[in-house]
Amino acid sequence: MPEITTIFNDGRADADIITALQEKSVEVREWTTELIKLYEPTEHTIVRDKQTRKDKVRSDGTTDVAARIYLGLEKLLVSRITSFMFANPPKRLYHNTEENDTRKNIAKAIELIYKHARIDSENIKRGKAYFASCEVFTIWYTVESPNTLYGFPSKYKLKCKSYSPMDGVKLYPLLDERDDMIAMSFEYTKKRGAESISFFETYTADKHYLWEQSGTGWKRIVDGEKISIMKIPGVYNWRPEPFY
């Protein structure tokens, strides 16, 4: 697999760069019509089955529609396993803070970041996406907004957002031969008036890129925005098969 620097630095056209970034490095069950019909009870076969559950036609021509009752056990299973993990919110432990005020303040700030990012409700969303659609990506980002939410004056707020196939987002993790992530890309659509516009976004350890679909091609609208922490600012989780 080519190094990420090669993908961006060998003079490729934007369409070719995106094609290379779409080389998904993990194998997961795709969130297609097949899985959706399993997960969504209203899509179960019994709802439309008129062969094994036939309607009864009376002698006077009236029809008694057969009872077709679906059971959303797959969705219930996903909800239950997510509740097992997150109904009682995980608690984080901080060591070696007892006699160090600086460390205590850091731990307090971390907890306030999670609180104001609503991490507990975000975890529920992430859990359902992970167990139902096999993958989820959570990105952390800053918003310029002066505040004192974290116990000290700050110019920025730290927020997070999760993406999954259940939201119509395609995820493309790119790993090297040691399974270290070298790029994380995702493709999504947004409404602009009556028009749906496709976007392709990529994060590497030091750069952020964003393309917008323009006509039949792609237009780069964020070209290598610097990531100062030198890490992909997100977490990707995946499993080969759905929990159900």
Each language-model region and where it sits:
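Structured, contiguous alpha/beta core segments that scaffold functional sites
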Residues: 133, 141-244
